[in-house]
Amino acid sequence: MSSSPTRGTTLKPIPGTYTAVEVSAPSELRVVERRVAEPGPGQVRIRVEACGVCHSDSATVEGLFPIDWPRVPGHEAVGRIDALGPGVQGWAVGQRVGVGFLGGSCGYCEFCRNGDLVNCRNQEFTGVHSDGGYAEVMIAKATGLMRIPDDFSSAGAAPLLCAGLTTFSALRNAPAKAGELVAVLGIGGLGHLGVQYARHMGFEVAAIGRGTESAELAKKLGAHHYIDSAASDPAAALQALGGAKVILITASGGKTLAATFKGLRPGGASIDLGVGPEPIEITSMDLIFGERKVAGSLTGNPATGDATLRFSALTGVSAMIETVPLEQAAEAYARMMEGKARFRIVLVTKDGISRQTSVRS
């Protein structure tokens, strides 16, 4: 399982311009040509091969965060280093790398000095504060890079940089031990990976979905139990199984978390990955009696990203994807927001299409 630079790999000379999909105003995605820039100190230039379309891209596309327009979205980008900026060490031209939501830590703030790179005070979010991967070329901080194992195609690796990393990191840091019951609520873009990771980490896995049509998929992904929230109370169903030590919430909505909270066993934790504006209505009695907890988990740092990719390669965890040409990003984004993706849409560039030679996608 190698992730080292390909020996003898040469990249074609980069042209003076490249194709990108940028947002110039809320909800306006357009294909443009941009001039190629040189990487600055501590940065690398990447020839993008694939970039996942993530629900969090709506923060940029819909202007939910303060944005300096125009901006290129995309934070599940995989490609090859084309140029190194001054001072970059440990990376090589031709090496295949990934860039996730966290654009790179500063290394000197209070949180970095205490080892908490996720909450770096000077962290830039890829595709929000800096241009992301909906493009043939991007510039990224070297401190935010992840190594891509040869086991994955670029398109197959892309969703693991956000959806995979987020679920893997939350489960790895969860207060559950192998053999204990872990529930994954939602079998979508995050949940279908969460079920796989939970199974391969040795947990007893309950998948919670809506409707009977997801039952077969849940079992195929590795769930020991399937709970249909449309047919029964999921909290009661979890208690019938002995109570969950952890409930991983991959679907947005405070009501969703609250509806399952009583399914936790004493000392259990509900970990929220789904961002939404709804308040979480849980009584203090539900928290205190049984000492149950609610926590949020944003994502993981680049080292955890490396671990996510290695673990996925070793265990066979993979994202269910469909690929779309970069130029069709607007249509792909619309389908994703309408809930029509099954389960991750990945944009591929011309470089990505020409390099589809990996063993597994």
Residue spans of the language-model regions?
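Glycine-rich cofactor phosphate-binding loops and adjacent beta1-alpha1 units
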Residues: 174, 206, 212-293, 353-356, ...
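Glycine-rich beta-strand-centered segment in the early N-terminal region that forms part
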Residues: 37-51, 62-110, 149-152
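C-terminal hydrophobic helical "lid"/dimerization subdomain
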Residues: 3-16, 258, 302-361
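Mid-domain Rossmann-like dinucleotide-binding core that forms the NAD(H)/NADP(H) cofactor-binding site
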Residues: 97, 150-236
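NAD(P)H dinucleotide-binding glycine-rich loop of Rossmann-like/cofactor-binding domains
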Residues: 105-185
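Rossmann-fold dehydrogenase core element
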Residues: 269-271, 281-322
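Short Gly/Pro-enriched turn/cap motifs at secondary-structure boundaries
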Residues: 24, 35-36, 68-74, 100, ...
